[in-house]
A protein has these predicted regions:
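Accessory interdomain/linker segments of ATP-dependent helicases and helicase-like nucleic-acid enzymes
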Residues: 1-89
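Pre-ATPase regulatory/linker segments immediately N-terminal to the P-loop/RecA-like helicase/translocase core
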Residues: 3-6, 60, 66-192
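Domain-wide signal for the mature, well-folded portions of proteins, strongly enriched
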Residues: 20-22, 35, 161-164, 176, ...
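Eukaryote-biased feature marking scaffold/signaling PDZ-domain proteins and nuclear chromatin regulators
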Residues: 58, 70, 76-78, 96, ...
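Conserved beta-strand elements of beta-rich interaction domains across eukaryotes
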Residues: 68, 88, 116, 201, ...
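Pre-Walker A (Motif I) flank of P-loop NTPase domains
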Residues: 186, 197-203, 226-227
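Acidic, Ser/Thr-rich intrinsically disordered and amphipathic helical segments
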Residues: 189-190, 202, 214-217
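Conserved RecA-like ASCE P-loop NTPase motor core of nucleic-acid helicases/translocases
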Residues: 207-209, 214, 218-238
Length: 238
């Protein structure tokens, strides 16, 4: 059934998420601070500056790197980070709280912390460092999307779920074919098929057969009939 298929997909996604997270943790712990610093994944050592509430009412703290300031880094707004402290014996203690970059430039960062307890822990550390943490944003979005589809009931989302994942037939509207002299006959038929679809239409074919041209024309024609069209792609190439 559609629900069991989606629940199975949830399970597989959870397994992938746990594996990726564990693999990130393993690589992080075995790489060593020096290599992470050279790759721009880590600042160590760092100093702490003032703490305050930003315009989003988030508790934030200023962080400044003390060494290796010429190395480019990958810290940027919205990325998750975690703090750690290196003991005099060389062992690293990672703090439990996950923080978020609020602002970053070449030598300074402003980091949003989850609470006053985390702030005190960061301020109290002697040999403090900060590094990128496993980014759960995309996984969180995927889990939420699957949950929305599973829970859908009596609405358009539920209809599309059952059409795409079960034997419920899709619907088509009767329209007069539109002529497109600048397209070949196959492309013209595909555009008309899209315009007739009430639920879903799939345009497919080998490379170089003009799928992108067909989709562009279908979007253009749809905008004559609808207010807006959402276009999604795995990359920006198309």
């Amino acid at each position: 059934s559609p629900l069991s298929d989606l629940q199975h997909q949830q399970l597989l996604l959870r397994m992938e998420y746990e594996y990726e997270k564990e693999e990130f943790r393993r690589q992080t712990e075995t790489m060593g601070i020096a290599r992470k610093v050279k790759r721009g994944l880590c600042w160590y050592p760092v100093g702490t500056g003032r703490s305050f509430y930003n315009s989003l009412n988030q508790l934030v703290i200023e962080i400044e790197r003390k060494e290796d300031k010429d190395i480019e880094h990958v810290f940027e707004f919205g990325r998750p980070v975690c703090f750690f402290e290196q003991g005099y014996d060389g062992k690293i203690h990672y703090f439990n709280s996950i923080c978020t970059v609020s602002y970053a430039d070449e030598e300074r960062m402003v980091v949003a912390v989850p609470g006053a307890g985390s702030l005190l822990e960061i301020q109290g550390a002697e040999r403090l460092g900060v590094q990128l943490y496993f980014d759960e944003t995309s996984y969180r979005t995927m889990f939420e999307a699957l949950e929305d589809v599973i829970r859908a009931k009596g609405n358009r989302l539920a209809e599309l779920r059952d059409i795409l994942l079960s034997k419920q037939p899709s619907c088509w509207r009767a329209t007069y074919p539109v002529r497109f002299p600048w397209l070949n006959s196959t492309q013209e038929a595909a555009v008309n098929k899209v315009l007739c679809a009430k639920d879903v239409a799939i345009v497919h074919g080998p490379p170089g057969t003009g799928k992108t041209t067909t989709l562009v024309e279908a979007i253009y024609e749809t905008l004559h009939r609808e207010n807006q069209v959402l276009v999604c792609a795995q990359s920006n190439t198309a």
